């Protein structure tokens, strides 16, 4: 059985809170990852628009959207799911805690919102979230859920267990390489204290980290395990 992962698209924050020079405001989108294990082909966090996701699949993996068996979101944020519509036949998966807790918050906001346009947007998000199944603990051989709450209420990464190392698709639990270097969580986290706990747990378990809005990072705290 071959376990393989690759980055389809490197994400970016709208405003990088740890950069001195910000430049122009960017459209945020999460890093998108393809995981292949057994008979499953899983896209994690399709944050770019559908035409771009389709192009990245072809360029990076020689695949079509129809080849994807599952889509997994580490968090139910718009910048994690812009490309969802291109995978209508795949299973849409999210952690049960994220689905239930975010669903409750969306319903509460909907009931309190007075603006009709805002209510329509909330209604769409609620309907979209209902399409998601609660992800099983094991999505595929050697690809298991790893809860990282804090960035969002039920944020959950995907832990890939290779023969000599662990790779964690961490989502917003680790924002960027700068956040890892400085030991910081994303400023707009839902629960900063809980996010810091999850951040520490990521460092303890992952040899390689796929962050929420950056390229793959080697965890120097555990690199000795890989190289000697």
Segments predicted by a language model, with ranges:
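Metallo-beta-lactamase
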Residues: 96-147, 153-226
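Zn-dependent metallo-beta-lactamase
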Residues: 1-39, 201, 205, 221-228
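Active-site metal-binding loops of divalent metal-dependent hydrolases
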Residues: 10-12, 46-48, 76, 97-98, ...
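Active-site HxH/HxHxD metal-binding segment of metal-dependent hydrolases
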Residues: 47-128
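Divalent metal-coordination and catalytic microenvironments
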Residues: 35, 45, 68, 75, ...
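Core dinuclear metal-dependent hydrolase active-site scaffold
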Residues: 7-8, 30-36, 42, 134-163
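Pre-active-site segment of Zn-dependent metallo-hydrolases
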Residues: 15-32, 37-70
């Amino acid at each position: 059985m071959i376990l393989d992962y690759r980055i389809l698209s490197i994400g970016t924050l709208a405003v990088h809170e740890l950069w001195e020079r910000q430049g122009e405001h960017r459209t945020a989108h999460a890093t998108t990852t393809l995981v292949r294990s057994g008979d499953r082909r899983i896209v994690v966090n399709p944050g770019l628009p559908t035409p771009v996701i389709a192009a990245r699949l072809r360029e990076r993996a020689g695949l079509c959207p129809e080849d994807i068996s599952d889509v997994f979101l580490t968090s139910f944020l718009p910048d994690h799911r812009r490309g969802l519509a291109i995978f209508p036949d795949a299973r849409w998966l999210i952690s049960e805690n994220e689905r239930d807790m975010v669903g409750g918050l969306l319903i509460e906001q909907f009931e309190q919102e007075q603006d009709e346009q805002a209510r329509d947007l909330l209604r769409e998000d609620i309907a979209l979230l209902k399409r998601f199944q609660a992800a099983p603990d094991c999505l595929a051989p050697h690809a298991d859920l790893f809860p990282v709450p804090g960035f969002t209420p039920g944020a959950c990464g995907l832990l890939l267990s290779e023969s000599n190392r662990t790779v964690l698709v961490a989502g917003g639990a680790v924002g960027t390489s700068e956040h890892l270097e400085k030991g910081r969580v994303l400023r707009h986290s839902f629960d900063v204290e809980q996010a810091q706990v999850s951040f520490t747990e990521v460092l303890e378990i992952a040899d390689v980290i796929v962050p929420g809005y950056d390229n793959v990072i080697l965890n120097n705290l555990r690199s000795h395990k890989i190289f000697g």
